[in-house]
C-alpha cells in the first residue's frame, strides 16, 4: 500500500495547529540508520487509509519528497471527539531485520462450524490479533483461524492454527493461549439449568 507524504520543516504546537487547519496531518518517520524525519500527510487520504485493515498490519511504501521507504504504521493520535487525526508515526523497516507486528485474525467457516450449524452455539473471539515476529517480506496481512471442524463447547488454541512460513508468534506468559471457542448462548444455558431444577423438584405431600 502506497502512502504519499511531504517533508515538514516547521515544528511546534502552533505550526501543527495551522497544518491541521489546512487539511494536513503532522507525522514522523523514524528508525533504521537514517535520522527521524518530520512529515505531513493529506488528512482525508490518511483518514480513509486508517479504516483499512491492511494499513495497520502490512508493510507500507511511504513516499516522501519523491523517495520511497518501507515503513510500518506504529501509532496515531485521534482528537477526543472530532473525526480528526492529530498525529501519525511510521517506523522504517529493513529487509534483513525482523519486525514485531500485531496481525489481525480472520475467522473462517464460522457459520458452517458443527458447533454452530448443528449445536446452535455461538462463536467467541477470545483473541482478535496475534503479535508476530518475522522478516518484512514474510509479514502476512492477516492469519486465518479455521473453525470448520469445531464442535460445541470446544476451544481453538494457538497450537491449532497453521502459521505462514517464516512467522512466529510472540506470547506473553501463555505459550498456547485460547483463540476462539464455540459455546451455548447464555439464555440456553439458563433455560437448561432451570429445566433441570424443575425436573428435580418433589411435589409437596
From Swiss-Prot:
**Entries under InterPro entries matching the protein:** Rbsml_bL25/Gln-tRNA_synth_N, Ribosomal_bL25/Gln-tRNA_synth, Ribosomal_bL25_b-dom, Ribosomal_bL25_C, Ribosomal_bL25_long, Ribosomal_bL25_short, Ribosomal_L25_dom, Ribosomal_uL5_bac-type
* Entry keyword annotation includes Ribonucleoprotein: yes
What GO biological process terms does the UniProt entry carry, in alphabetical order? translation
One Gene Ontology cellular component: cytosolic large ribosomal subunit
Q: Which CDD domains match?
A: Ribosomal_L25_TL5_CTC (cd00495)
Tagged with keyword Plastid: no
**Span of the secretion signal?**
none
GO molecular function: any one? Answer: structural constituent of ribosome
Give the superkingdom in one word.
Bacteria
Pfam families the UniProt entry points to: Ribosomal_L25p (PF01386), Ribosomal_TL5_C (PF14693)
Q: Where is this region: Disordered?
A: 184-205
Mark out the compositionally biased spans (Low complexity): 186-205
Q: Which UniProt keywords apply?
A: Ribonucleoprotein, Ribosomal protein, RNA-binding, rRNA-binding
Family statement drawn from the similarity comment of this UniProt entry: Belongs to the bacterial ribosomal protein bL25 family. CTC subfamily.
Protein purpose: This is one of the proteins that binds to the 5S RNA in the ribosome where it forms part of the central protuberance.
Q: How does it assemble?
A: Part of the 50S ribosomal subunit; part of the 5S rRNA/L5/L18/L25 subcomplex. Contacts the 5S rRNA. Binds to the 5S rRNA independently of L5 and L18.
Stated name of the protein: Large ribosomal subunit protein bL25
Question: Organism source for this protein?
Answer: Cupriavidus necator (strain ATCC 17699 / DSM 428 / KCTC 22496 / NCIMB 10442 / H16 / Stanier 337) (Ralstonia eutropha)
**Primary gene name:** rplY
